[in-house]
Structure formats: structure tokens, C-alpha cells
Amino acid sequence: MVSEVSRWFRISLLNLAIVAFIGVLLRYKIAFSLPFLDQHYLLHGHSHFAFAGWITQALMTLMVSYLFVSGQTSAFKKYRNLLVLNLITAYGMVISFPLQGYGFFAIVFSTLSIFVSYGFAFSFWKDLNELKDERISKWWFKGSLIFSVISSIGPFSLSYMMASDNLHEKWYLASIYFFLHFQYNGWFFFACMGLLVHRLELMGIHLDIFKKSFLYFFAACIPAYFLSVLWIPIHTIIYLIVIISALVQMYGWILFLKLIRANIEKLKINLSK
């Protein structure tokens, strides 16, 4: 299994190197002319590939390894097709976006990428339910899958506005920020926390306080979206809910830091091995 995880994770790291290289090109074009590359198109390719080819690919790999160490020994065989499909859509986007922007092939690959994420969410949720023991890490992973699916509302609403020729700047930005918020603060954050909590579980750290921390972060994630669009006129009640969600997130972090502080010596010993 180690070689399987290593193989897939090396691909993710290779994709990170590609992300970094494109980032260098983007900065190079600020000072020097590369007329055969459109800055705006290249930026789209960079961002889409960073999300799908680097972060999502890495998280999927690590989450599948979680299933493996939890007793599902055929996990990588089962998820191989989804991991390959995610790579295909990611490479498709990093090629098509710089060439045509939001053209036909770029839209096809980005749409397929969303459907791959649906497939992963559905399969992984089912496999989590097959783990009979009650682990707090399962909560975080399920939260990440929920927000991964929710985030797709952003690009689909954007596609609808473009197709109906009803594109308004505020709604355009709101759709983009919707996707970004539920990717960063939902899918990415909750998946990373799930991996961290799993590591703490393996160390034998008592994690009951993490149940509360999860509930606070999960409850605050949806209303916290409005922190990204405060320039849109919103009702005073919604504004108050947004403030409360920020405070709830802060309290969730306090609970997390209290747990880390209470187990700092055990963490030092285990992480130094």
C-alpha cells in the first residue's frame, strides 16, 4: 500500500510543480511579453489545475489511504478509475484553458471534473458508512464531501448566467466566491482536518472535544460565505448571523487549540518518530 500511496502522491507533487511553473509564467508575463500566451486564459488554467490536479488529487489520494489503513484493503483498486479520471480532467483543463479560455473543451473538462467529484463523494460516503467504529475523523470527511458537492452550485449558476445571457457583475462574482468559499473553507479544510484528526486518533488522543469543534465549524461554514460578499446588500438579520458564524468559528479554533495544548507532550513524542 505504501508504494501505491507514494505513486499517487508523487503525481500530485508533479502537478504542484506544474502549478508553480505556470505561476512563474504568469509573473514573467507581467514584465516581459509572451504574445503567444493570453494572461487571462493562462490564469484560468492555473487556478483550475491547482484545485483539481494538485489539491483535490492529493486529498483524494490521502483519503483513499485512510480507507486502506482502516481495513478496506482494496481501496486503491476501487478508486483507481476515479483518480485517473480526475487527472484526465485536470490535464484537460490545464491545456484547454490557456488555448481557448472558457471555450468548448475547457467547459467540457471542467464540467467532467465536477462529476468526478460527485462520484468520489458518493463512493467515499458509502465506504465511510461501512466503517463500523465511530470515529470523529469520519464526521470531518463527511463534512468535506458535503461542501465539495455544495461548491459546484457556484460554477453551474455561472454557466446558467452565461448561457442565458444574463450575466451581472455582482452575481458573477458571487458565484465565483461561492465556489471558492466552499472549496477552501469546506472541502479543503474539512478534508485536511479529517486527516489530522485521524492521525490524532492513531496516537490515542482523547478527542471528545473535537466533536463540538466539528459541529461549530460545520454550522458556521454556510453563513460564513456571506463574509466573502459583504459588498452585496444583505438584510440586517443575515448580517448578524454572519457575525455570529465568525465568532462560532473562532470558538471552534479555541477548542482545537485547547486540545493540542493538553496533548502537546504526546504530540512531540509521536511526531518526532
Where are these regions (language model features)?
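Hydrophobic alpha-helical transmembrane segments of multi-pass integral membrane proteins
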Residues: 1-273
